[in-house]
Regions:
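ATP/NTP phosphate-donor binding region
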Residues: 1-82, 93, 136
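ATP/nucleoside-binding phosphotransfer catalytic cores, i.e., glycine-rich phosphate-binding loops
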Residues: 3-10, 70, 235-333
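Short glycine-rich anion-binding loops that position phosphate/pyrophosphate groups of nucleotides
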Residues: 12-13, 88-90, 112-114
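Short Gly/Thr/Asp-enriched flexible loops that form oxyanion-binding sites at enzyme active sites
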Residues: 71, 76, 88-104
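Structural motif
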Residues: 85-86, 109
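Short, acidic/small-residue loops that bind anionic groups at enzyme active sites
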Residues: 95-123
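Short, glycine-/small-residue-rich phosphate/pyrophosphate-handling segment
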Residues: 112-146, 150, 155
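ATP/pyrophosphate-binding catalytic subdomain of soluble kinases
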Residues: 137-259
Length: 333
């Protein structure tokens, strides 16, 4: 499969500078005729010495995550065949939100901290596989997350409320302060429970309301997307049932901290058992939660979306086919 007209977006903060090098290799593998991309570090620097005609987009009036979204929209308007995005799960989610409703598929090259979402076509170390590869377009389900009735972002791996997000510092995956991350700072911080005496989580389906958890039961809240890999794995608990019922998403609330990069074995042993509560989510459902401790942040695929106050209400909904992603066919070498 060949792509004559390619849009390119590079997150220069991903992979400790490896994103731009991976972009060069990706373009060599795909060999497009024309490339639309942001000037300089957002993609233009990857085009030096390549034969493709470059269309450089001036993003200088923008900063932060708004740059990727703006470049993505200009690429779609130019009529590209595919958007090649180099970054992590959060960058890919930002781009998917920016072009929501477009027929242009995403080719995601994972250069971030986790790189576990379904929009990742391949990892940076595997970009050589793109040369002469065959792809299939996959319609990917996703989560819409927001606060007080307004959608703020998309998640294709998970949506969480937490004090920290994952980031890479000196080549190591660590927990960093979510509020600091909103301003581009990676400040190490230990995870903390988000729940207090007034915390609540419910699922709504029309007039039917199901209480999921409350108070100290809510140390961690994760909405995610189960799939058929859980089928037959009974130890997965409620997630297994969602996979059997073809429910596109679910919510897990746990009395332990689950999103962490370090764990003291002895302390964890003393704290067991681990108690969790789970509900499946259909497209007709709306998950709502509030009463969090001060400083908790709503995050989607590692992107901090909103600092929550005690009176704010977070919501999550699921939609099938929320994005179009390219997947390497199994017989591709």
């Amino acid at each position: 499969m060949t792509f004559e007209r390619v849009g390119l977006i590079v997150n220069p903060q991903s992979g400790a500078g490896r994103a731009l090098l991976a972009a060069v290799e990706a373009l060599r593998a795909l060999a497009p005729r024309e490339v639309w991309t942001g000037a300089g570090e957002m993609g233009g620097d990857a085009l030096a010495g390549l034969p493709a005609t470059a269309h450089l987009l001036d993003w200088s009036a923008l900063s932060g995550r708004a740059r990727s979204a703006w470049i993505a929209q200009r690429c779609v308007e130019a009529g590209v065949d595919v958007l090649v995005v180099l970054g992590g799960d959060g960058t890919l989610a930002d781009v998917a939100l920016a072009i929501q409703g477009s027929a242009v598929p995403l080719l995601g090259v994972g250069v971030g901290t986790a790189n576990v979402g379904p929009l990742v076509t391949c990892l940076a170390v595997d970009v050589g596989r793109l040369a002469g590869a065959e792809f299939e377009v996959v319609h990917v389900p996703g989560l819409l997350a927001g606060v007080n009735g307004a959608d703020l972002g998309l998640g294709f791996n998970d949506v969480v409320v937490d004090f920290t997000v994952l980031a890479t510092i000196d080549g190591q995956m660590v927990n960093v302060d979510a509020v600091g991350k909103m301003s581009g700072q990676n400040i190490r911080r230990d995870p903390e429970p988000i729940g207090g005496p007034d915390t609540w989580v419910i699922r709504r389906e029309g007039a039917i309301e199901t209480q999921v958890a409350e108070g100290a039961q809510v140390a961690t809240l994760i909405a995610g997307l189960p799939d058929k890999r859980f089928y037959g794995k009974a130890i997965a608990g409620g997630v297994l049932l969602s996979a059997m019922l073809d429910e596109p998403a679910g919510c897990l609330v746990c009395d332990h901290l689950l999103i962490r990069t370090t764990l003291d074995p002895a302390a964890h042993r003393r704290s067991e058992p681990v108690l969790s509560r789970y509900v499946g989510l259909r497209e007709t459902d709306r998950l709502e939660a509030g009463g969090f401790r001060t400083g908790a942040v709503l995050c989607a695929d590692g992107n901090p979306l909103a600092l929550m106050s005690a009176t704010d209400i977070a919501h999550v909904r699921v939609r099938r086919g929320l994005a179009r992603s390219l997947r390497l066919k199994e017989n591709t070498r």
